[in-house]
Structure formats: C-alpha cells, structure tokens
Design a protein with these regions (language model features):
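C-terminal transmembrane beta-barrel domains of outer membrane proteins
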Residues: 161-163
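Active-site pocket scaffolds in enzymes
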Residues: 167
C-alpha cells in the first residue's frame, strides 16, 4: 500500500526519510513564445526570437526498508528535453569566487565555461539527472542522516558532446 504524497508545493519534499512509502511518476511540458533571442548570423545583427519548449519525465521513490531501524531508500530521476533556441547555453557558477569567471575569451586555457566552478547548466538539448540516497539507522536521539549520490548527464546542441558529473551530499 502506497502513501499519498502532498501536492501543495512542487519543490517542498525531496525525501520523507522513510516516514512514507511513496512512488510518483510525472510528466510535464512548458512552452512560451519569444523567450530568447539570437542574431541571424555573425554579420547580420537582426534578431530571431525563439519559443522556449521544455518537456520532462520523472520518477520519485521513497521507500522504508526497516521501520524499526528507520532506514529507507530514496530515488529520484528526471529526463529533460529543452529547446531555448539555436545553440542556447547558459553557464552558472554558484558562489564562484574565481577571478576568471568572465569566460575563456579573457582567460584562454580555462574550461569551456570559463574559470572557477562555472559550467553549462541549461540549454537547448537534453539533461538526465538521478539521485539515490539511503537513510541510515536513526540515532538514539531520533536524528536521521541520508547520504546521497547524484549523477547529471548533459548534452547541449552548442557543445556537441555530452558531459557527466557526480556529486555527493548528506541530508
């Protein structure tokens, strides 16, 4: 028997830490006209307006493994197909303190996105993101910890080849 998941906010709960048994499968799409713009060519400065089109398919599982110990499995995976216009890529660098954050034109020899932790984060192409976590046995005071690993695979049209990234964390 599966528990019902609250649908109040789409971004509120990432794990129930074994308190619920939840399986959700979702799909969504979004389209909006004239969201991005690009030049027709390097020599033609007139702009082409692009319609943003996004599609996503995801699955979420939060499954108690041993209720007495408080252990649980947490799994989330999503696949996005995004179209922001021809060759659109957006680089982000959260709390990037690198002096060369303005890009490779000013700092040849750095990564495609520039210095520091800048990386292509979204753009026209596909993104697959997966997170797997395991809730460890509860401590005597009732505290729970969930170490997790994530993997992100991105393939943006402008870059041409795909890239992958692993991350580790603790809830």
């Amino acid at each position: 028997v599966w528990d019902k998941e609250s649908n109040v906010l789409p971004f509120f709960v990432g794990s129930y830490l074994g308190a619920k048994k939840v399986l959700n499968v979702g799909a969504g799409w979004y389209a909006h006209k004239d969201v991005t713009a690009n030049r027709k060519s390097a020599t033609d400065t007139s702009l082409v307006l692009n319609t943003q089109k996004n599609f996503g398919l995801d699955v979420f599982l939060d499954m108690p493994m041993n209720k007495a110990k408080g252990t649980a499995l947490n799994f989330y995976s999503v696949y996005y197909i995004n179209d922001y216009g021809k060759n659109y890529v957006r680089n982000l660098g959260i709390l990037n303190q690198h002096a060369a954050a303005e890009g490779i034109s000013a700092n040849p020899g750095t990564s495609w996105a520039g210095g520091g932790n800048l990386q292509p984060t979204l753009g026209t192409g596909n993104i697959w993101y997966t997170q797997v976590g395991y809730v460890l046995p509860k401590l005597k005071n009732g505290t729970s910890f969930m170490p997790y690993v994530t993997f992100t695979q991105k393939k943006f049209d402008r870059i041409g080849k795909s890239s992958g990234q692993f991350d580790l964390g603790m809830n």
